[in-house]
């Protein structure tokens, strides 16, 4: 089982949803980076439950630094981070342990490995993404040294959506962070949709967009290591992710070349582009424009409506998430922090690779 992501800057996550703790080991972080346990709090709080319409599971998600930091600075050695699971309730999973959960990876996992941890999804649980968010904090610090910043936000939930990519600014970022749903969409409309889902015991998918500051470093390579290819690999590894696009993406199939192609212009005595339909990447390499993309998330599979299933002995049965179960009606809201982290992790790795591209 592969639990490592990245090349020069890499992370290895470990732990299960209902185990004592989860964690991550980060390799390749340069020495001298300022790092304090409090640096993790803002990002971890954006992923944590507790917002309106999210899972009632209450995890403090305090990040403990076990290695790789001395006197507030990274030492260049592996950084080990640990997050304790403090609100585990396994009883609801034991009650239906004899049958497969529709929409989950339990059956596939068992067929591949011969056994499975059924408690909260075990290793395949979205609980693992807390480790990615923690590692993403360190990646963001590396990128900040090169004036590269990323912001993710909920751009679609139900009928509410924003199709364009706003320009990244401190004001826009603050508006997103101040929103209970990390979204520029109407908060009242989102809350109404989530309340309806909870009343109907149902769930809904969503879309998370990400935008960056202009990336003047030439990140990515022209063949297998295209920036969008590495982003797709990382972002599509997020639980419940079902689609990825960069720039105009799938909408470009409805465009003429004369409409889609971004013209080159001179701006402030530098070569720039008059539009950014490409999403900031040409030939798989960033070209000084913002990097923009979207990730589609499926509806949460854990809902209280009953579904046909089979038992582990092959008998027809019914599966319904218990009333005591704690799940999100829309995973895309809490996935915002995870998308932002994965983009930062990919870009930090590509940035360090770029340092080795030529003399």
UniProtKB/Swiss-Prot annotation:
The keyword Lyase applies. InterPro entries: Chorismate_synth, Chorismate_synth_AroC_sf, Chorismate_synthase_CS. Keywords: Amino-acid biosynthesis, Aromatic amino acid biosynthesis, FAD, Flavoprotein, FMN, Lyase, NADP. FMN binds at residues 123-125, 283, 298-302, 326. NADP(+) binds at residue 47. Pathway: Metabolic intermediate biosynthesis; chorismate biosynthesis; chorismate from D-erythrose 4-phosphate and phosphoenolpyruvate: step 7/7. GO terms for cellular component: cytosol. Pfam families: Chorismate_synt. It is an enzyme of class 4 (lyase). The keyword NADP applies. Reduced FMN (FMNH(2)). Its EC number is 4.2.3.5. This reaction introduces a second double bond into the aromatic ring system. Belongs to the chorismate synthase family. This is Chorismate synthase. The gene is aroC.
């Amino acid at each position: 089982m592969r639990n490592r992501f990245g090349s020069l800057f890499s992370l290895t996550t470990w732990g299960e949803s209902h185990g004592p703790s989860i964690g991550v080991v980060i390799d390749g972080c340069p020495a001298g980076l300022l790092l304090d346990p409090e640096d993790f709090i803002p990002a971890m709080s954006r992923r944590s439950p507790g917002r309106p319409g999210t899972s009632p599971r209450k995890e403090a998600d305090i990040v403990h630094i076990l290695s790789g930091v001395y006197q507030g600075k990274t030492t260049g050695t592996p950084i080990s981070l640990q997050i304790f699971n403090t609100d585990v309730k396994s009883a609801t999973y034991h009650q239906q342990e004899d049958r497969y959960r529709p929409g989950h990876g339990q059956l596939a996992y068992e067929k591949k490995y011969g056994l499975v941890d059924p408690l909260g999804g075990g290793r395949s649980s979205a609980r693992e993404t807390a480790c990615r968010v923690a590692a993403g904090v360190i990646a963001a610090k590396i990128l900040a040294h090169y004036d590269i910043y990323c912001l993710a936000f909920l751009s679609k939930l139900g009928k509410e959506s924003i199709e364009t990519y706003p320009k990244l600014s401190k004001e826009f970022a603050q508006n997103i962070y101040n929103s209970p749903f990390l979204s520029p969409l109407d908060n009242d409309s989102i809350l109404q949709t989530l309340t309806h889902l909870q009343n109907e015991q149902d769930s809904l998918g969503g879309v998370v967009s990400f935008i960056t500051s202009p990336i003047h470093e030439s990140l990515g390579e022209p063949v297998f290591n295209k920036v969008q290819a590495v982003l797709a690999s990382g972002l599509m590894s997020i639980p419940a992710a079902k689609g990825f696009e960069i720039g105009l993406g799938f909408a470009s199939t409805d465009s003429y070349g004369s409409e889609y192609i971004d013209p080159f212009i001179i701006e402030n005595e530098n070569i720039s582009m008059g539009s950014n339909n490409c999403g900031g990447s040409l030939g798989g390499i960033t070209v000084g424009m913002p990097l923009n993309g979207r990730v589609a998330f499926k509806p949460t599979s854990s809902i209280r409506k009953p579904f046909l299933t089979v038992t582990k002995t092959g008998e027809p049965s019914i599966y319904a998430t218990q009333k005591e179960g704690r799940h999100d009606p829309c995973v895309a809201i809490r996935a915002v922090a995870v998308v932002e982290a994965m983009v930062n992790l990919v870009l930090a790795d590509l940035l360090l690779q770029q340092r080795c591209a030529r003399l």
